[in-house]
Regions:
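Alpha-helical structural signal in soluble globular domains
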Residues: 61, 65-70, 94, 98, ...
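C-terminal alpha-helical cap/extension of soluble enzyme domains
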Residues: 5-16, 37-39, 199-202, 206-295
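Active-site beta->alpha loop and helix N-cap motifs at the rims of alpha/beta catalytic domains
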Residues: 3-143
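Alpha-helix N-capping/helix-start residues
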Residues: 19, 24, 56, 148, ...
Length: 295
């Protein structure tokens, strides 16, 4: 690895929708709000952005509009993963051609590749682009997890700069940091693990919660980077009930419900995702109130 991308709190941005398509005015407002709130990077069209149910034309327009609007103020990273290596290459090339600062590539889902296959997959994608690539490890969704040895092999590639680690395994994170050293960044892929990952030497978080508490997530990582670990721990604990509520149903269902309550965007989702149950919505709203989260 020879390129850096960002250090801090990146938001895994939702894709605002209407029943008829993408809500671009809401997306524009969200981007400005995040930049003003200290968000360090924008991650588009990934899990939280419902990338799996966007059309090719929608993806292209979201990427092009967002990059033009951001105009270099923060890095824009695009989710380009697929369980088909050729598709991941094509999506990554298109994002880079549009001006993305980097790509986020999830481990191939459903196929359940071997570790050797994972190395070949990510290497093929990284070979095809001239921008930084972040591996995204989320075995709860994909059915496969990278090992620290796989990360160590991938870290030798000049374009592979780190991993968004959402396995929840601190043993894996520690082993990865030990094996890969400072040249390979580890971002927490779970909001609840942010302070702990940063305290171990992680580069920050790619956050769902930042969609509604961007300033708080930015402050959390900054406290860690300033070695104010006890303060960071207290802030992590304060946010913990809200973070748990944001995952009482599968992401991004709760975060869109929270954002709709705040007037940030609608809670429109695309099937097979659907609206929250009333019971879970009440739980989420109570957690928001307890944490002082409002429009």
């Amino acid at each position: 690895m020879s390129q850096s991308l960002f250090r801090g709190s990146g938001v895994a941005l939702v894709t605002p929708m209407t029943p008829d398509g993408i809500d671009f005015p809401a997306l524009e407002q969200l981007i400005e709000w995040h930049i003003a709130s200290g968000t360090d990077a924008l991650i588009l069209c990934a899990t939280t952005g419902e990338g799996a149910t966007l059309t090719y034309a929608e993806r292209a327009e979201i990427i092009e509009r967002s990059i033009r609007q951001v105009n270099g103020r923060v890095p824009v990273i695009v989710g380009t993963g697929s369980n088909n290596t050729a598709s991941a290459i094509a999506l990554s090339r298109e994002a880079c051609a549009a001006g993305a600062d980097g790509v986020l590539v999830v481990t191939p889902y459903y196929n359940k590749a071997t570790q050797r296959g994972l190395v070949r997959h990510f290497t093929a994608v990284a070979d095809a682009v001239d921008r930084p690539l972040i591996v995204y490890n989320v075995p709860s969704r994909t059915g496969v997890s990278c090992t620290a040895e796989t990360y160590a092999a991938l870290a030798q590639h000049p374009n592979i700069v780190g991993v968004k680690e959402a396995s929840g395994s601190f043993a894996l994170i520690q082993e990865t940091l030990n094996l890969c050293g400072d040249g390979f960044s580890v971002w927490s892929g779970n909001d609840e693990d942010t302070a702990a990952v940063c305290a171990l030497g992680g580069a920050g978080v790619i956050s769902v919660a930042a969609n509604i508490v961007p300033r708080e997530m930015h402050r959390l990582v900054e406290l860690c980077f300033a070695d104010r670990i006890l303060e960071a721990g207290r802030e992590q604990l304060r946010l913990a009930p809200l973070i748990r509520a944001l995952f009482c149903e599968v992401n991004p269902i709760p975060i869109k419900s929270a954002m709709a309550r705040m007037g940030l965007c609608s809670d429109v989702l695309r099937l097979p995702l659907c609206e929250m149950s009333e019971e879970n919505r009440a739980r989420l709203f109570a957690a928001m109130d307890a944490c002082g989260v409002s429009a």
